[in-house]
């Protein structure tokens, strides 16, 4: 037996080791951060709170909010 320490072997990159290329997102220009910063767009849905939810928690919360006005 030899007294040399074992040297690690280097493996070539396999196809599966490479990074996957993802397609570029094609956002409408009105929905980009640049349009938002320039004031041309609103990234939030304007009617996000228009949804009526009628569960017990919501009813109790509305009642509490009305009493605190």
From Swiss-Prot:
What residue range is the signal peptide? none
Q: Which domain of life is it from?
A: Eukaryota
Biological processes per GO annotation: double-strand break repair via homologous recombination; filamentous growth; maintenance of DNA trinucleotide repeats; mRNA export from nucleus; proteasome assembly; proteasome-mediated ubiquitin-dependent protein catabolic process; regulation of cell cycle; SAGA complex localization to transcription regulatory region
Keyword vocabulary terms for this entry = Proteasome
Q: Where is this region: Disordered?
A: 1-26
SMART domains tied to this protein: DSS1_SEM1
Example of a GO MF term: molecular adaptor activity
> What segments bear the compositional bias annotation Acidic residues?
14-23
One GO cellular component term of this record is: proteasome regulatory particle, lid subcomplex
Looking at the keywords, is Phosphoprotein present?
Answer: no
Q: How does it assemble?
A: Part of the 26S proteasome.
Protein role: Subunit of the 26S proteasome which plays a role in ubiquitin-dependent proteolysis.
| Family designation | Belongs to the DSS1/SEM1 family.
State the protein's name: Probable 26S proteasome complex subunit SEM1
Q: Which organism is it from?
A: Eremothecium gossypii (strain ATCC 10895 / CBS 109.51 / FGSC 9923 / NRRL Y-1056) (Yeast)
Q: Which gene encodes it?
A: SEM1
């Amino acid at each position: 037996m030899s007294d040399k320490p074992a040297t690690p072997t280097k493996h070539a990159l396999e196809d599966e080791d490479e990074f996957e290329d993802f397609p570029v997102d094609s956002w409408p220009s009105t929905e980009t951060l640049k349009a938002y910063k320039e004031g041309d767009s609103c990234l939030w849905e304007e009617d996000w709170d228009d949804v009526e939810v009628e569960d017990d928690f919501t009813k109790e919360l509305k009642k509490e909010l009305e009493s605190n006005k």
